Amino acid sequence: MKSLGNNDKFMQEGLEYIKQIVNRRGSRDTKLLEICRFLNDKFTGFDWVGFYFSDNLKKELILGPFIGAPTEHRNIPFGRGVCGRAAVSGTTVNVADVMAESNYLACSLEVRSEIVIPIFKFGQFVAELDIDSHQSDRFGNSERQFLEQVGQIISVIF
């Protein structure tokens, strides 16, 4: 159970588990950290999994809970890097090869690909789910669709 492929059962079970996390008692950050841990544990190549919260007034992203190597990118201006680009576009950004990305903020020399899922609540951009991989072209269509559903599920806790 380390990669989705076309495994609809795995996908459904994962979404159900994330719904259970969201519906538990506890703080938002505790729930988000548990979701990070789940994604990191269940998917090979999800090497850094974390959330950035949106400060729409300052037009910047603020680092939230994450699993993986520490990052110096605690605040990211909208438009800067892959995360900042997703904040501006409001759409998922999937980068197969970060080395070919001119607007890339390097978090680690090991990172090869990245996917960022914007999260909205009542039409307002509130956060992002950011996942880095040490594998090139790690995130396929199945993973993208799954992660976008994760974003929809967790939007209620913002």
Predicted regions and their residues:
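Short hydrophobic/aromatic beta-strand element in the GNAT-like acyltransferase core
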Residues: 48, 116, 128
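Intrinsically disordered, low-complexity terminal regulatory regions
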Residues: 1-66, 70-71
